[in-house]
Each structure stands twice: as structure tokens, then as C-alpha cells.
């Protein structure tokens, strides 16, 4: 093979591989688009379900509060009604006494008067229940929770066991579940030592924790593999306040002291041998009695004796050793930083709940309006049928796609144009009678063509014996060279081109003796049939040109075989 042919084959192979890669990439992109649409529908349904459930909870809370208002009103009303009934009863008694005293003037009513006065003194003349009633709610916290509720993630998230659970299980903070664990093994020392540390439990007003780790579920594998928390001495001892008041005092051994020669005050020199833990236990028993008798002011630093301008290396070393006891810490070092969602909370002006849609994050850029390309069908319709001539609205629409009419003007204009092309009016009635006759003749001709095609397929023996090969036939059988139409009838397809080699020998052996005898007879018969075959071929070609038979019929007609069919047809194997 020449190098030029090898190069062509290599280039062809590369082109085929590139086309296959492009087909695969196109299929992946189409699949991603379909998945994107389905995922967006699913996320919308999840969002709608979540918001609806929480709205139901909020509505239930509203109904419960309304019932509480009715209950308080009923209780206070009953109390005031009872008090009012007692006062009205006593007032009636006084009215009766006044009437009797004015008209009778008897002194026998003194006992009744004293009884009424005693009742009056025992009754409370002020309302027993106050009419005050108010509604108190932390609207700022609720508004902040609503505006920062929910996020849309566009990246693939790692699947874990916690995501397989229902989302309703995540409504309660995980912090309350963690409290059931053993605090001695899971809680670090910095959380139970005295000191200021962030509180994660919910207060009375339902101010839940803002720490996301208190709300997110943790998988079981991470809990089992979790080791004990690391202990930082500086953080633990830096938060000491009154720990020495309840911790047991440790008995320390006596250490030999050396006075500093460069300082004017007494200071304890701490050597490296003092940190030897092996010698500490031996010295504890010997120096236990003498250590308790020492005065506290002998080893404490007296800062008043130090001159301000002098720098003492021993004092610097002392400060470095006791630095954890005096070092202060800042809460901003361990508090979580604010994210983008909290920048909306820095507003000074109050926003009502109806205007929550106007809230925008300060860091979010304004959305850019997408550029929409007009549909080519709509552009063609604009050119063919102007919008001003068909639009039925009070104000002409900008395009057919944005038509505000009940029936789209574009559809009506397109249907009217199609009916006009067919020679019909807007109701579908033909305008001219000549067009109906032409249409009926055209339909009859089409029916005749279909009938001829069916006849050629169902009864191939009735068609011409050897039709002319078209381009499709020449491509399907390139090794057969066609002769003239006249010779094609005389010389049909030879069986030698189709039969098995063994069958060829048998057929050739049987035909050789009779070859000379049959030659003269064939010449005579051929001359008689030439004229008839020519007429049949012309008839066949004219029928094909008139009816326009498909090329597939021509392909199957040229594949007719001669010879005995029993010799070359496939037969099933006989069982012995």
C-alpha cells in the first residue's frame, strides 16, 4: 500500500474518532439539559412544600394565639360580670331601703341598713380584673429568620446518611440530642471550667443558636471515629476566675531559692531542675511540715520596689512563665465570622413583611436582562403579514409572541395565509370551481400511483422481467455490467454467478452435451421475441416515468435469480 493511501486512512480514522467524541459530548450535554429541567422542577416542588408547611405552622400559631386571646377575654369578662352582678344586687337593696325610708319613715329598717352597709364594706368597688391586654412578639428576629431562610445550591453535594432522613427531623437542634451523651468523655475541659463561654441552649424567648454545627446532623461513622478533643492549657487556664477556691491545694516541695543580684527586690529563681517530676514526689514528704509554716509574703513579688526605668531579665522571665494567668482573650477570635447573608441585617430602616421582596443583598450584583433572539418563524410571519393589519388589541402589540388577545393574532394570520394559498376563504370554502376539479384530478392521480406501487410490491411477477437499473441498483450490484435493453431480455441472469461451486460443476456437466443442439433453437426463438421484448421494455419505462415507482422496487426487481430454487435456497437440517 502506498504511503498516500495510509495517510488517507489515518486521516479518515482521526475524523471518525473526532466525530464519535463530538456525538458523545452532544449526547451528554442534552442529557444534562434534561436532568437540569427535571431537577429544577423537583427543587421547586420541595421549596413549595417546605414553605407551605412552615406557613401552616405559622398559621396554626396565629390560631392558637387568637384562641388564647378569646380565653383571656372570657375569664376576665366572667370575673367582671360576677362583680357587676353583686354590685347591682346591693344597689337594688339600697334603692328599696331609700324608698321605704322616704315614704314610711319607720325605724324598723335599721337592721336591714346595717346589713347592707356591711355588705358594701366587704365588696371591692374597683374592677377585680384590668382591661389591659397586649401582644408582644420579636418581629425583628422573625423577619431576619424569614429573609435568611433557605439557600439554592448549584453544586453537587456529598451524600451522607443524614440527607437520607426526612427533612422534618432537622427541625430540632442536634445540641439537645448531644446532651444525652456522657459529658466526661465528649465534653472538653474548657466547657465545664468556670468562665465565659458561648451558650448553645435555647433561652426562654426561643432564640435558637446561630451556630450551624448545632443544627446539622452528623453521620454515625464520624462520631465513632471521633477522638477526644484536644486540650489547650493556655485557653483553659486563661479562663480561670475562682477555681482555687474549690480545688484541693497541692502540697509543693521546698525549692532552694537564690536571690537575683541584678534586682533590688527578692524573687524566686526557677531552675530547670524544678520541672523534674521524678524528684518532686521524694521531696514532698520531707518538706510538707515546713512549707505550711512559711509566710506568703516571702515569695510573692513586691512590685512597688521595682524602679520603672530599670529592665530586669528575671522579671521578664517571670512574666513569660505566668503569662497564661494574666493573658486576656478576645471573643472575636473564636466567634464565627459573618457571611453574606448577614449583610442584609445591617439596615437601619424597618421593612414591613409585605415589602420583603424588595430586600436585596448589598454584595449581590444587579441581574442583567437576558438578550432574547426572535424566533425565525415569527420573523417570517412579520415580513409576510404585517402585525398592524392583523392585531385586534386596543394598542398594537410589539410582536406576535406577546399578543394580549384571547386568540393569538399570529395563529389566525397564519391559518388565513395557508387557506389563501389553497384557494379557500377564511371559513375553508373553495373560492373557484376549477380549483376543486384540479384538486380532485390530482387526488385520483395520487391514488393511481399508490395502487400501482402496491401492485408492483404484491405481484412482482407481473412486472417486466429486467428493468433498467437506476443509480441505486448500480451501487448495490456494481460487479454486473448491464447490456443493452435488447440483450438484457435475451440473456437473463446466469446461475453461475449465484450457485455454489459444487453445483456449478453439476450444472455445467449436464448442459455441455445439449449445448450444440439447443443453440440453433435459441437463435430462432430469440429473433421472434426481440420485437415483443422491445415493446415490453418501452411500456415498462413509460410506466415508471409516469407513476414514479420508488427506487427500492427497482432494486428488488434486478435481484431475481435464475436456475432451480431448490439447489440454492437454504433448507433446515434434517434430523437422523
From Swiss-Prot:
Intracellular or extracellular location(s): Nucleus; Chromosome; Cytoplasmic vesicle, Autophagosome; Autolysosome
Cellular component terms (Gene Ontology): autolysosome; autophagosome; chromosome; cytoplasmic vesicle; nucleus
Stored InterPro entries: NCoA-4 (IPR039947), NCOA4_N (IPR022174)
Effect of a null allele: Morpholino-mediated knockdown severely disrupts erythropoiesis.
Single Gene Ontology MF annotation: transcription coactivator activity
Main localisation: nucleus
Coiled-coil ranges per UniProt: none
Tissue: Expressed in the intermediate cell mass (ICM) at 24 hpf (hours post-fertilization). At 48 and 72 hpf, expressed in circulating erythrocytes visible in the yolk sac, heart, and liver.
Signal peptide stretch: none
Superkingdom to which the source organism belongs: Eukaryota
Key word Nucleus present: yes
Biased composition (Basic and acidic residues): 514-529
Alphabetized UniProt keyword annotations: Chromosome, Cytoplasmic vesicle, Lysosome, Nucleus, Receptor
Polar residues bias locations: 432-442
Region (Disordered) residue spans: 425-447, 510-529
Keyword Nucleus found: yes
GO BP, sorted A to Z: erythrocyte differentiation; intracellular iron ion homeostasis
Function noted in UniProt: Cargo receptor for the autophagic turnover of ferritin. Acts as an adapter for delivery of ferritin to lysosomes and autophagic degradation of ferritin, a process named ferritinophagy. Plays a role in erythropoiesis, possibly by regulating hemin-induced erythroid differentiation. Binds chromatin before initiation of DNA replication and detaches during replication. Inhibits activation of DNA replication origins, possibly by obstructing DNA unwinding via interaction with the MCM2-7 complex.
Protein's name in the database: Nuclear receptor coactivator 4
Gene, per the UniProt record: ncoa4
Amino acid at each position: 500500500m502506498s504511503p498516500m493511501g495510509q495517510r488517507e486512512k489515518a486521516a479518515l480514522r482521526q475524523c471518525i474518532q473526532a466525530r464519535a467524541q463530538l456525538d458523545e459530548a452532544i449526547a451528554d450535554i442534552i442529557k444534562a439539559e434534561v436532568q437540569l429541567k427535571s431537577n429544577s422542577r423537583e427543587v421547586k416542588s420541595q421549596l413549595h412544600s417546605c414553605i407551605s408547611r412552615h406557613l401552616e405552622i405559622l398559621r396554626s400559631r396565629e390560631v392558637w394565639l387568637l384562641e388564647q386571646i378569646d380565653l383571656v377575654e372570657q375569664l376576665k369578662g366572667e370575673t367582671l360580670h360576677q362583680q357587676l352582678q353583686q354590685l347591682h344586687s346591693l344597689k337594688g337593696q339600697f334603692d328599696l331601703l331609700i324608698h321605704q325610708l322616704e315614704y314610711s319613715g319607720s325605724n324598723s329598717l335599721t337592721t336591714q341598713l346595717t346589713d347592707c352597709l356591711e355588705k358594701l364594706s366587704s365588696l371591692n368597688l374597683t374592677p377585680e380584673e384590668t382591661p389591659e391586654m397586649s401582644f408582644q412578639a420579636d418581629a425583628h428576629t422573625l423577619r431576619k429568620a424569614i429573609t435568611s431562610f433557605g439557600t439554592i445550591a448549584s453544586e453537587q453535594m456529598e451524600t451522607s446518611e443524614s440527607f437520607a432522613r426526612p427533612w422534618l427531623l432537622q427541625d430540632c437542634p442536634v445540641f439537645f440530642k448531644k446532651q444525652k451523651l456522657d459529658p466526661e468523655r465528649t465534653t472538653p475541659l474548657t466547657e465545664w471550667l468556670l468562665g465565659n463561654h458561648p451558650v448553645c441552649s435555647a433561652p426562654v424567648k426561643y432564640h435558637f443558636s446561630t451556630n450551624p454545627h448545632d443544627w446539622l446532623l452528623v453521620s454515625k461513622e464520624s462520631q465513632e471515629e471521633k477522638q477526644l478533643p484536644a486540650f489547650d492549657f493556655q485557653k483553659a487556664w486563661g479562663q480561670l476566675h475562682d477555681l482555687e477556691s474549690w480545688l484541693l491545694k497541692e502540697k509543693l516541695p521546698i525549692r532552694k531559692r537564690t536571690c537575683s543580684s541584678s534586682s533590688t527586690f527578692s524573687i524566686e529563681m526557677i531552675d530547670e531542675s524544678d520541672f523534674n517530676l521524678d524528684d518532686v514526689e521524694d521531696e514532698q514528704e520531707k518538706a510538707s511540715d515546713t512549707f505550711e509554716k512559711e509566710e506568703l509574703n516571702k515569695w510573692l513579688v513586691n512590685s512597688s520596689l521595682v524602679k520603672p526605668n530599670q529592665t530586669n531579665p528575671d522579671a521578664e522571665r517571670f512574666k513569660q512563665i505566668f503569662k497564661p494567668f494574666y493573658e486576656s482573650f478576645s471573643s472575636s477570635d473564636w466567634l464565627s465570622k459573618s457571611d453574606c447573608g448577614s449583610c442584609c441585617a445591617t439596615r437601619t430602616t424597618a421593612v414591613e413583611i409585605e415589602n420583603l421582596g424588595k430586600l436585596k443583598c448589598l454584595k449581590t450584583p444587579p441581574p442583567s436582562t437576558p438578550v432574547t433572539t426572535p424566533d425565525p418563524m415569527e420573523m417570517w410571519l412579520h415580513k409576510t403579514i404585517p402585525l398592524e393589519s392583523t392585531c385586534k388589541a386596543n394598542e398594537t402589540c410589539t410582536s406576535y409572541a406577546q399578543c394580549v388577545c384571547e386568540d393569538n393574532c399570529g395563529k389566525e394570520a397564519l391559518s388565513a395565509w395557508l387557506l389563501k394559498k389553497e384557494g379557500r376563504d377564511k371559513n375553508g370554502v373553495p373560492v373557484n370551481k376549477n380549483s376543486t376539479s384540479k384538486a380532485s384530478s390530482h387526488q385520483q392521480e395520487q391514488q393511481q400511483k399508490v395502487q400501482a406501487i402496491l401492485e408492483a410490491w404484491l405481484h412482482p411477477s407481473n412486472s417486466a422481467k429486467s428493468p433498467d437499473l437506476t443509480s441505486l441498483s448500480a451501487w448495490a450490484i456494481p460487479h454486473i455490467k448491464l447490456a443493452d435493453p435488447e440483450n438484457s431480455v435475451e440473456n437473463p441472469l446466469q446461475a453461475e454467478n449465484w450457485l455454489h461451486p459444487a453445483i456449478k460443476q453439476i450444472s455445467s456437466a449436464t448442459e455441455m452435451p445439449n449445448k450444440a443442439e439447443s443453440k440453433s433453437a435459441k437463435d430462432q426463438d430469440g429473433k421472434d421475441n426481440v420485437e415483443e421484448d422491445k415493446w415490453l421494455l418501452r411500456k415498462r419505462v413509460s410506466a415508471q416515468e409516469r407513476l414514479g415507482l420508488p427506487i427500492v422496487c427497482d432494486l428488488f426487481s434486478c435481484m431475481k435469480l435464475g436456475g432451480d430454487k431448490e439447489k440454492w435456497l437454504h433448507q433446515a437440517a434434517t434430523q437422523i
